[in-house]
Amino acid sequence: SPAINVRGRGSYQGNGVLVLVDGVEREINDLNVDEIESVTVLKDAASLALYGNRGTDGVICVTTTRGGDNKLRTRVGYNFTVQTPFRIPEMADAVSYANAVNEALKNDGLASRYSQADIQALQNGTSPLANVDWEDQILRKAAFNHELNLSFDGSNQRMRYYVFANYTSNRGFFNNTDLNDGYSTQVEMYALKLRTNLEANISPTTVARMNLMGRLMQYQEPAGGTSLKNIFNTPPIAAPVYAPGGGWAKNQMFTNPLAVQAGGGYKQTLRRTLFADLTLDQDLSMVTPGLSAQLRVTYDNSANILDQRTRSYAYSIATPVLDNAGNISDLSYTRYGNDTELSFSSKLDWQVMRTYIWGKVNYEKDFGMHHLDVAGIFSKGRKKYLKANNTY
């Protein structure tokens, strides 16, 4: 979730800003911009009066879009986004790296690791040593995102409705992600979301509002993780990407960044979310003018399911071979490990279930130039958290 500060960086007892979506405490990142009708920010006494200690750091009240007083209206929207890295350091090539290593050793009073003949061979492209641009192997220049929105709303004499559907597809910056048959090691996120807001006049004095939101999100990443540290830690001269006999290559000190990113399989996270709340507004003017009551029942359920498809891969360690003059004339390769099939494991990573009931009785009356507004509020909630357990 984004970090939001209403009253500065500090917070009282670490509570943070209280976010209410249609009167229910929920995460603001569960919302799409197109489904927001209004946002109200409360702070200081305004938030304390209504929400007590929980509102000491401010309250953000978000109201989702409701059905309008009109016939059926349909909207369709499509967004295409191109993302590019803000800045990526330019990495040294093999010649620059070899010269830098020699200079560092010289400053410590040690002998050079690479001879002038080795460096000249690197410049000429005749050296057996590698000159791999790991940044180019791992990253591509841009990522492409797609978003499709569909909504329709309207009303009749007794009901107002609003339906919003959203599909999002995001692909990451990794390169060479289709090296394996049957699966990709790209960072990908796909999400499908549906929201329905209904409001009905049950009687002349009773209004019912029901809000439903469901979302399915699938996130995929390489089993080796998404860290870019291997790009910066592995020098271009360490080893070729592949060994001459096939399979990945590396040396004794440094790993093969592309093997970590593309060779170990993938993992997927499936998140399912359901938000539901029902609110009844009752006008009690028949009892006494200015009296009203409100009752809200809420049920939220979110779960994370983690699927992992991992495998081991064979690799060959490259070792320089020196000629009689001490120059690097070749690379020898020693093979380790074996290529294995994808394994499979699936588990419920976590699940959160939350029920909440909220009631309010309100009385308003004008006395000449004075206005009286009194409210009594009752709330009770229950939150249940399930930890990880295997589903097989």
Over which residues does each language-model region extend?
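Membrane-proximal, glycine/serine-rich, low-complexity loop/turn segments characteristic
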Residues: 1-18, 24-29, 46-273, 279-285
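Short loop/edge segments at beta-strand edges and connector loops
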Residues: 43
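Small-side-chain secondary-structure face that scaffolds active or pore-lining regions
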Residues: 166-191, 221-227, 241-243, 271-273, ...
